[in-house]
UniProtKB/Swiss-Prot annotation:
Membrane topology recorded in Swiss-Prot or TrEMBL: Multi-pass membrane protein
Annotated family: Belongs to the mitochondrial pyruvate carrier (MPC) (TC 2.A.105) family.
Biological role stated in the UniProt entry: May mediate the uptake of pyruvate into mitochondria.
Superkingdom: Eukaryota
InterPro entries reported in the protein's UniProt record: MPC
Protein name as catalogued: Probable mitochondrial pyruvate carrier 2
Bilayer-spanning residue ranges: 39-55, 73-91, 99-116
Chief subcellular location: mitochondrion
Pfam families the record matches: MPC (PF03650)
Alphabetical GO biological process terms: mitochondrial pyruvate transmembrane transport
Subcellular location field: Mitochondrion inner membrane
Organism: Dictyostelium discoideum (Social amoeba)
Record flagged with keyword Hydrolase: no
Lineage of producing organism: Eukaryota, Amoebozoa, Evosea, Eumycetozoa, Dictyostelia
Length: 133
């Protein structure tokens, strides 16, 4: 356990995501994009992408119900629900905690709706058995 702790110790408290020479020269060349190299900004953006992508797929109709992975949608719905609840417990409440709750509620809602779409599609595929009396 101490070996694992020692291995991960250099990453504790590190806010910088990309520290190689290519990334640093890129962010020096384009300083307006430097906020992407901070985990405080990049993590919420990645979290929102877990909500925005399914919402756009639902609205545009590009993801058909038969292509929805129920296990993935279930885990993301559960994660969104748990983190939404957790965000309401954080004290003190501020804009960051409210945005955390909103992001996770959106993730739970859109993936919950995808589960509904998939189960509705599966039920429509069941062929009723006719009575032969």
């Amino acid at each position: 356990m101490n070996a694992l702790r020692g291995l991960l110790n250099k990453y504790t408290g590190n806010q910088i995501v990309f520290s190689n020479k290519y990334a640093t020269t890129f962010f020096e060349k384009f300083p307006k994009l430097a906020f992407l190299n901070n985990v405080t900004n990049l993590a919420p953006m990645m979290k929102w992408s877990l909500s925005i992508v399914p919402i756009t797929q639902i609205l545009s109709g590009t993801k058909l119900p038969e292509n929805i992975d129920v296990y993935q949608a279930s885990s993301l719905c559960a994660t969104g629900s748990i983190w939404t609840y957790y965000a309401t417990l954080i004290s003190p409440q501020n804009t960051g905690t409210r945005m955390l709750a909103a992001c996770n509620a959106a993730m739970a809602a859109c993936h919950g709706y995808n589960i509904y779409r998939r189960t509705k599609w599966e039920k429509s595929q069941i062929i009723p058995i006719e009575n032969k009396n």
